[in-house]
Amino acid sequence: MAGGLMQLVAYGAQDVYLTGNPQITFWKVTYRRHTNFAMESIEQTFNGQADFGRRVTCTISRNGDLAYRTYLQITLPEIGQSLSSGAVYARWLDFPGEQLISQVEVEIGGQRIDRQYGDWMHIWNQLTLSKEQERGYFKMVGNTTQLTYVCDPNFAAIDGPCSANGVRQVCAPRDALPETTLYVPLQFWYCRNPGLALPLIALQYHEVKINLDIRNIEECLWAVSAIDGTGTKITDAYKQSLAAASLFVDYIFLDTDERRRMAQNPHEYLIEQLQFTGDESVGSSSNKIKLNLNHPCKELIWVVQPDANVDYCSSLTASTHLNNLLGAQPFNYTDAFDALPNAVHAFGGQASASGANAVINASGLFEDPFSNDIQSSVLDSGAATGADSGVSDAGTFVLAETALDMHCWGENPVIVAKLQLNGQDRFSEREGTYFDLVQPYQHHTRAPDSGINVYSFALHPEEHQPSGTCNFSRIDNATLQLVLSNATVQGVNTAKVRVYAVNYNVLRIMSGMGGLAYSN
């Protein structure tokens, strides 16, 4: 008897629980037929010029039957040496595509349905973005060495139609920040689930609008005349405008029968919204944050950000901490500065900032990596000369690229936290590490950066299918109690607490109009 047949006849009472009355087979594929449809991404323009510090609106045209994934396309201007008679050292702050979004909202028939923030988009992607998608997403939102690492007048010129002899390899650091187009995926309910795509065909009497508030350029760009502690602000760099801005919407085209049903029948969608009650300023170690929330919420997410991390004015003042670290740190949610600066110079030695013997330059890139005669930035005071740099051009490039997602910053500002509902503890007091390590490990795709704290009422908060909520509409008094680290609020130091909540609501569409079933 063949061994496989012996296994087959070794059938007992316990096997009934596994293979009795079978419902599927692994040996004949089955599938389900779907309705016929087509999909096309169509560009939508804003009313008025989209630029730094402005609010613009895009009315979603009725090009298709449904509106699905929506991307913000923004082209950053070139920031180069021509903006000053002297040297220009400049960089876009981390994740420029997210940072330039102050807030973005979707409204139907004049009613705001949801509002989100660049800060929230960063936090959400820290929790949900898979490692496989990370590299592509970083490029989409501009978190690359070409944009977020400081440019240097001694580096290679930008390759373009007017510089036929320019270095074309992306690993060569440049003397300017190139004009670059970013693609920022919006995270509204209808963008993340095809079953929630917005039925434009059923909204004959209501317009759908996307309102976008763009941050001032001072909160997105860092540009000075020197990086040795004596630099001053490059005024002309902050006069630049966005080269272009628009939306790309994935339109869905339905077949005749489904199109008719979609247009004529009423619809109810269970949607997700974001609640944010604003920044709460704190200056002491023990704090009670009142949560003015409504609706069934599936998770709370909060950060505590020291004001010193985002002091944009201070970052342009010579010899201040943020000036030495090459700009403000808007996505640093820890109690200390990130001491790893966004600069090629940090990995190739301090002397690589200037002179013909830069660690990476246009002419010597990867040709003779050990020919550089620069000296190490760390010198023995008793030695006549310093040691040669041991980091090659290739090594410097690898270190710089690897460091894009590495940080030398502090710890979670939250030492302990506790949630109280109507004066009763929802859970016992927990250490901050429980909220930025254990909770994300249990409920999310990835572990976020330090300082992003989570408490989930749902088993699977990333999924649309409800798996647990807490109805804050039925809670009279909700309080988040936080004890913060000394480094966060020591002396006159202050910080901002931001609490976000993801809740469910119902969007009703009938008679050509749409609106929320439950208001605040």
UniProtKB/Swiss-Prot annotation:
Subcellular location: Virion
Domain of life: Viruses
Any one of the GO CC terms: T=219 icosahedral capsid
Principal subcellular localization: virion
Gene Ontology molecular function, alphabetical: structural molecule activity
Gene3D superfamilies: Adenovirus Type 2 Hexon, domain 4, Major capsid protein Vp54
Keywords from the UniProt entry: Capsid protein, T=219 icosahedral capsid protein, Virion
InterPro entries according to UniProt: Capsid_N, MCP_C, MCP_C_sf, VP_dsDNA_II
Reported function: Major capsid protein that self assembles to form an icosahedral capsid with a T=219 symmetry.
Similarity-based family: Belongs to the NCLDV major capsid protein family.
Protein name per its UniProtKB record: Major capsid protein
Lineage, uppermost ranks: Viruses, Varidnaviria, Bamfordvirae, Nucleocytoviricota, Megaviricetes
